[in-house]
């Protein structure tokens, strides 16, 4: 799918998100080797946590801060609601008991995939068609700046 240069940093993170969703789903369904995902539940939880810490939190903030004001109200609500649910599910996986962790990881993987597809197929094309080039350029510049900061923060945290 063709994506405007300005939104490519978010699309790149969506690619990472789809890989994590795929790995978690395969691992939880008993096929971890096919996706390179951890075989045990603690490893699967660690994968979700790493993704949350290194990508998801900053990604959520960037989308809501930079795109939210340009979207239709229903899309802004859905964006915020699904982001909150993704973070809630990672929290359950991180802090819950084993049965809850498995269920939360499964729900997280399914929602993550659905959410990314919605953004890439509907939300981003809408934004690209309704936001002028100058604003998209401003958004793209801010995304690049945030991406550099997020990578720097992730390196210093590890």
Predicted stretch roles:
Residues 1-158:
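Small-residue-biased structural context
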């Amino acid at each position: 799918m063709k994506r405007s240069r300005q939104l490519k940093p978010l699309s790149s993170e969506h690619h990472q998100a789809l890989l994590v969703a795929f790995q978690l789903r395969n691992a939880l369904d008993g096929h971890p080797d096919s996706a390179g995902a951890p075989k045990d539940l603690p490893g699967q939880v660690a994968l979700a946590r790493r993704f949350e810490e290194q990508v998801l939190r900053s990604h959520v903030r960037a989308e809501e801060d930079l795109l939210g004001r340009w979207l239709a109200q229903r899309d802004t609500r859905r964006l915020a609601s699904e982001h909150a649910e993704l973070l809630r599910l990672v929290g359950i996986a991180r802090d819950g008991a084993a049965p809850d962790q498995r269920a939360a990881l499964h729900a997280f993987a399914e929602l993550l995939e659905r959410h990314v597809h919605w953004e890439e197929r509907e939300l981003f094309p809408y934004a690209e068609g309704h936001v002028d080039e100058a604003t998209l350029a401003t958004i793209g510049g801010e995304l690049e700046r945030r991406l550099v900061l997020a990578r720097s923060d992730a390196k210093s945290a590890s």
